[in-house]
């Protein structure tokens, strides 16, 4: 006897169910296939359900396996019931073929000897033609087609046409009703011509082998961008399948690549290398036009647009509606619009401060966390910084590069902040009025004083700072009081000077108001009336004239006094001479 294509090893065969159970399973499978796979063609292979085999004796060994149903039923059907049997004719077929058999439930009582005959096994060849056997040893009172796989275990799954069982059942019914027996060849329906289209399930998801390819509707949305691969977890789209697979590892796989400088981990070594450039400050991508360098190639490509010969509107097509600035992409425009609107969507979780840019929030968060990702790579230097600009300024100290020079004294500094602090010493406006209470050092601003106080590291810095502020306030109040006292003293001195001036003026006025002294008899001032007698004689004596002409040297009043003195002396001399 030839070996059957079915595996005869009972180890690979599960327990054989009853005929009623097989019929229920078959009806359930056909129902589920009608619901889930409404279209022709399916990418899912049906499961193989072992059946109860009853091989008739009329089939020869060359075309199949012959066995009497009544005599061999006990050998092949140890689990079957005594009153119900299932009859399937098995014919050897190539391993790529498909067998469709009519499964019948024959209510056969042993006391009845008559059986109705029907068509036997139906086989589909690899070319697609249906072959029915003309065996008369089968019993098909009720024709319920069932799919039986003829492949050995481990073979490739077969493509099953869902409606094939119904068509075979109708064919068997017509042939059985027409005369009961003859076999024939039934041609399957021709497949539709043209390119195969993606089959859609009722749930709306496309049925395809590659889970990363976009659906037809999504292809239309991303046709302009050229992104045909989408992540199933976060719906991001990518240009190539490799990029999407690398991205998908962030959702499903672990991140074995850890940064040696911080606690971040990455799923790909390329992402880790790109992240390490942040700590090292390396910028391997340089611009050929302006010699600027960038950490990522995409940043260099975006920067190269500035040097392009295209028009400015083409390079920066996105224009701000509030001002005349233009931008190369929408993200830069959205970031710029926050300046006009005042929106600050990024909030600090520690102090509730808000920022317009995410990078500003990240820099601010490092103040609370103490993270210093920018470390100096100079041998023997272990300094780290929160910002890249601070690291670049620190590197100039190792290189002895001091590009910031003072135009007054020609001193040079490594950064602009140091130069600005130095320039304040050349101006009177920025005087060093903030003095340290511990070492008496003075600074131009309170911020510098606070930084200096941290170096002393006192046990209670805040109290000392408050005491210093109170002492400064007291000193300022005392200075104001002294200034007020000086102002009052000056006012008093001015008042005294004014009083003295007024007194001198009053004394001068009193001296001017006193009457002149009496004159001698023989001296008459010019214009005086003659002495003596009668009223109105025409002979008037001329006034005596002074023999001393002192007019060029003295004014009239002093001249009068001198004349009186000289006259008195003359009278005395004459009196002495006469005596």
Swiss-Prot record:
Keywords (A to Z) from UniProt: DNA-binding, Metal-binding, Nucleus, Repeat, Transcription, Transcription regulation, Zinc, Zinc-finger
Region described as Disordered: spans on this chain: 171-198, 500-553
Name assigned to this protein: Zinc finger protein 384
Molecular function, one GO term: SH3 domain binding
Main location class: nucleus
InterPro entries for the chain: Znf_C2H2_sf (IPR036236), Znf_C2H2_type (IPR013087)
GO cellular component, one term: nucleus
Family, similarity comment: Belongs to the krueppel C2H2-type zinc-finger protein family.
Keyword Transcription attached: yes
Subunit details: Interacts with BCAR1.
Function: Transcription factor that binds the consensus DNA sequence [GC]AAAAA. Seems to bind and regulate the promoters of MMP1, MMP3, MMP7 and COL1A1.
SUPFAM superfamilies assigned to the protein according to its UniProt record, in alphabetical order: beta-beta-alpha zinc fingers
Location(s), subcellular: Nucleus
GO biological-process terms attached to the record: nucleocytoplasmic transport; positive regulation of protein secretion; positive regulation of transcription by RNA polymerase II; regulation of transcription by RNA polymerase II
Entries under Pfam families matching the protein: zf-C2H2 (PF00096), zf-C2H2_6 (PF13912)
Compositionally biased region (Pro residues): 514-523
Tissue: Expressed in osteocytes, osteoblasts, and chondrocytes in bone.
Positions annotated as zinc finger (C2H2-type): 229-251, 257-279, 285-307, 318-340, 346-368, 374-398, 404-426, 434-456
Composition skew (Low complexity), residue ranges: 500-513
Biased composition annotated in UniProt, kind: Gly residues: 175-185
Keyword flag Repeat: yes
